[in-house]
């Protein structure tokens, strides 16, 4: 007997209008927000970095890859090229904590040169200045600050240049507040200047970017002078005697290290010049008392050798006779 087939009809259930929708739109919206955030981040970075820093960032991105192990961990913030130090909050001023990498360098960790090994005194010869420069270079290499410190031995003394790079800014943009890295660097250099009794010149330098009108009367002259004085105060706070400083100068943009690119970060710097004794005497002659200087002696000798006019001799004789008569009358 043939089996009968049964047809089953299933009534579709009508969906209500208040049934919740799926979450696919949330994923799309999240992607949109991430893209928008990335856009604003790129615009912000382009605003805060200069031309040289942009070149360095582009070169780094072109030369590195997340798949290349030779470039290390891409999430390592210690090697970040970001203008903001992701390893620490750069908005918080330094409290001079000795745990900082720069300050702890001279706390007896056992690596690098010993500042206490320097014999206190005046460094005048080229050999002495070269040895002092070597100590500073080894210290900066130990703390990975080679790109921020340049030491040069000159006939007049030792020139130490502290400058910006694309990783570290010395001061807040347009201000005279030291960033924590350079503040600790100056505090670490202070014990060295305590041992070296040579006079010190501190000069501040800016780039050629002028201040906008909204800043009123502020200028690169005032800014460079303020930054140089902040460097002096930091060194004194670190232990350097205040009488070591012979001159604090603001140079504005009149001595550019990179004149081809006046707006370059190389031009924003602080220079510490350790003067030899002869160079310090020359500076004293220019700005100090010149009564006993060679120039004054030569001037007096020239005046003494000038020919005397007859009328001046007669007037001098008459004045002398009057003075003698007054004395006799007394």
Curated annotation (Swiss-Prot):
- Gene Ontology BP terms: archaeal or bacterial-type flagellum-dependent cell motility; chemotaxis
Where does the chain cross the membrane?
27-48
Please give the InterPro entries that the UniProt record associates with this protein. Bact_OuterMem_StrucFunc, MotB-like_N_dom, OmpA-like, OmpA-like_sf
Q: Where in the cell is it found?
A: Cell inner membrane
Periplasmic side, ranges: 49-330
Q: What does this protein do?
A: Probable integral membrane protein required for the rotation of the flagellar motor. Might be a linker that fastens the torque-generating machinery to the cell wall.
> What is the designated name of this protein?
Chemotaxis protein LafU
> What gene makes this protein?
lafU
